[in-house]
Amino acid sequence: CYSTITLDLRVNPIPSPAVPDPIEVCDEDNDGFTFFDIETYESDIINGELDITISYYETLTNAQNAVEPLVSPYFNIVPDSQIIFVRAENDLTGCFNIVEQELVTLPSPVLPVIIEDIILCDQDGDGVTVFDLTQRDDDILGDQTTVDFELTYHETLEDAETGDNPIINTSSYVNLSNPQTIYVRLEDLNNGCVSTGEFDLIVSLPPVIIQPTPLELCDDE
């Protein structure tokens, strides 16, 4: 004797996450390590699918088992270039797929630890004179060339960081105060990374001449 029943088989599709572009971050100290916002391309990875949860892992095994997810910002553990694994899981079916995400540190321009101040004498005592900022160009650039790097000078740190309002008359700049801090911006034209530094313009005032008191001596003769 036997009986029959109808059994419905349902095959749920797995998510189809998009492979993201590498996440590139400028490395301020050029040691190959920095913090990454690993969620940068999350919407691109989801690729318009509904009910998808994204999580990130250091190893493929962890991604497959959904253990030890990473938290953003993430500090890379492999210098210069590291692959992490992105798990895209359907909240309704539990089906998942995994794609790789590359993390890349970009080298930043190298500035001297200390940029030497420019000190000039002031002949008229008003604390103002003309400075040639370009005399620091070679010290700042070092082995870096103007073919690959752009050097600009700025009056504020904010302008140096954003690249706004560069000083135009760099070879004949008149100081605004004494001393005055000048901010340096060095940009890598290949990767867009920027380093900033500073040095002072100092006007050395002439000494104040004091009229001596007349010296009187008695003449015994």
Residue ranges and their predicted role:
Residues 1-221:
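Extracellular low-complexity Ser/Thr/Asn/Gly-rich intrinsically disordered segments
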